[in-house]
């Protein structure tokens, strides 16, 4: 985990983190855990009637992968804000890859502030989720 941002420069790109490929089992387990039983995520016939070729992943499942990856880099108490938009659907077999880079770095009083660009893409580089995160570290952290 990063505690010291002194050496981080704007445009620094953190190593990517890859998540497991999306499976039907993963979607079923997430539906059970989240209570989101929308049939577009678990019923292939429903998905096909909606014009899709198969079920699609829950947007918040993809968001949870982004959050998990971010907390692997920065402790959760330092993450002050996450703002994302869902750009495209994530399909069965897609492998979510978390990307993060430094947009801005600022030191103000005893606070070290980072604005990050975050995204989830798939194995082909197609963006699924895009946004920003704000990190705040104090001199005491």
Region locations from a protein language model:
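Hydrophobic beta-strand-centered segment that forms part of the acyl-chain substrate-binding groove
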Residues: 48-57, 61-103
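Catalytic strand-loop segment that frames the active site of acyl-thioester-processing enzymes
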Residues: 1-55
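Hydrophobic alpha-helical segments with strong N-terminal bias
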Residues: 7-8, 43, 67, 72, ...
